[in-house]
Design a protein with these regions (language model features):
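Entry/capping segment at the start of metal-dependent catalytic domains
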Residues: 7-24
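Short amphipathic alpha-helical segments, especially helix-boundary/capping motifs
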Residues: 14-18, 59-63, 149-153, 177
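N-terminal strand-loop-strand
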Residues: 22, 26-69, 88, 103
Length: 177
């Protein structure tokens, strides 16, 4: 309708007269909901000629005691000049914290983004999944750390039998597809 077109024109005109710094000072970021962002890694290696997936057993809630892929929350800061870590930095950090595998010791590539509402019972969480390959000679260096109660290199059948926390079975399925 004409009234809406006039309002849009007025808004566009207002933004044109502001400098970017004025716009950013007046920007109301609280107007938009903020989902949490996590990174999860589907980590693979070959042990005794069998494809294995690095799994952790969760130390705490939610899904305490369940199998999960290594991962965790992106460190975000509320400072426009220092907004926190990048996704890939978070993936390397989480992999090192939960498995003790040193940064740069494995191939890591972004796989897919998972954002289905309800995928995490704590809050709205969007997860950026990564595909990782660990050379077999380094696989034995992996040790549970951080919020992992234990760690294991399992074959796909073992994982299917035990099930996984969150939507990690879906992430794993995407990684092997």
């Amino acid at each position: 309708n004409i009234h809406n077109e006039v309002e849009v024109t007025k808004l566009d005109h207002t933004f044109e007269s502001e400098s970017e710094s004025e716009f950013l000072k007046a920007y109301q970021k609280q107007q938009y909901a903020k989902p949490s962002v996590t990174v999860d890694m589907a980590v693979f290696t070959i042990i005794d000629s069998v494809l294995r997936v690095l799994t952790i057993q969760r130390k705490g809630h939610p899904y305490k005691g369940f199998l999960a892929l290594p991962g965790g929350f992106l460190n975000v800061k509320d400072d426009p000049l220092d907004q926190g870590e990048d996704l890939e930095e978070a993936a390397h950090r989480e992999l090192e914290e939960e498995t003790s595998l040193p940064r740069g010791s494995c191939f890591l590539e972004q796989l897919y983004t998972f954002g289905k509402a309800g995928r995490d019972p704590r809050t709205r969480v969007i997860s950026v999944a990564y595909f990782a390959l660990v050379p077999p000679h380094l696989a034995y260096q992996a040790v549970a750390g951080d919020d992992a109660a234990s760690l294991a290199w399992l074959n796909l059948e073992e994982i299917q039998q035990k099930g996984m926390a969150f939507d990690h079975a879906e992430i794993l399925a995407k990684a092997i597809a």
